[in-house]
């Protein structure tokens, strides 16, 4: 069984290591990567990410809605393309299935 919380934690560390400027778009901006798990705002975001992954795996994810919510935050296809690469690394490192198709579904709505 995949530990999706571990996958999500690895994803965000990978994302913010590769693209540190992206962390500034979150309520936990400025929190050291090693301290993310103890930050309430990060925990909320990580939980939402796990929920989305769970929905994507069940075939009930709202890719259009997620894309729409991110447009208002000035986040689009380029950022999700970067996220896709980081998520692939996190999935591979944690024995999880590739979620590239779920990210592509989001990207298709930008």
From Swiss-Prot:
Gene Ontology MF annotations: heme binding; metal ion binding; oxygen binding; oxygen carrier activity
Signal peptide: none
Binding site for heme: 70
SUPFAM superfamilies, per database record: Globin-like
Keywords: Heme, Iron, Metal-binding, Oxygen transport, Transport
Entries under Pfam families matching the protein: Globin
InterPro entries named in the record: Globin, Globin-like_sf, Globin/Proto, Mb-like_M
Ranges for domain Globin: 2-110
Statement: the UniProt record of this protein carries the keyword Transport: yes
Family: Belongs to the globin family.
Quaternary organization: Homotetramer.
The protein, known as: Body wall hemoglobin
Source organism of this protein record: Cerebratulus lacteus
High-level lineage: Eukaryota, Metazoa, Spiralia, Lophotrochozoa, Nemertea
């Amino acid at each position: 069984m995949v530990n999706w919380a571990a996958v999500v934690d690895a994803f965000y560390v990978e994302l913010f290591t590769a693209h540190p400027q992206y962390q500034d778009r979150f309520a936990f901006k400025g929190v050291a990567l090693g301290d993310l798990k103890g930050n309430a705002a990060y925990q909320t975001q990580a939980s939402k990410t796990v929920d989305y992954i769970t929905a994507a795996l069940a075939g009930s994810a709202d890719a259009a809605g997620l894309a729409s919510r991110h447009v208002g935050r000035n986040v689009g296809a380029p950022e999700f393309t970067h996220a896709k690469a980081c998520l692939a690394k996190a999935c591979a490192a944690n024995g999880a299935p590739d979620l590239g198709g779920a990210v592509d579904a989001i990207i298709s709505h930008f």
